[in-house]
Amino acid sequence: MRIVFDLLMRIQKRRQLPLLLIGGWAVQAHGYARNTLDVDCLIAIENDPVMAEELTKAGFECFEEKPSFRRFRHRLQPFLILDVMRVNAVTFEKMWAACEDYDMDGIPMRIPALKHLLALKIHAAQNEHRVEKDLGDVLALLRGNPGKISAAELQGICDQYGTPALAEKLSAFL
């Protein structure tokens, strides 16, 4: 996956395209190591054409597209998969302002703050096929980062992106 991280770093520098590393790698950066087979990043939707152009130049092709994300696979190395989540500029700027630097095996990346990563995971868990994995990540992040998220913050995240019942269940892990 180092090749994908290196590519993302080069795109950021060459095109001044801010992006955040999300998904399993960001979960690992926040202290919960788990296997992941792809790389996920987050961009402002306004930067999507530039990102797609750069990925195409680097040998990637889009093989799945939904309103909020696109999945890319390398044409010659199909096990290299990059998911690009797209959000509006206001959401991205809020997350960018609070993001953290992270050294990914010598490659400088940025990851969402813990509260924003939890919001992404709780939002993703609303999709039936993702509940187990994403809520597992949420529980592991809460357990691995005691005291970093208050009960009120968790309640607010769940109210906005999940359900009140979920907040009640998760608060036991604070």
Question: What positions do the PLM features span?
Answer:
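Compositionally biased terminal segments of proteins
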Residues: 1-174
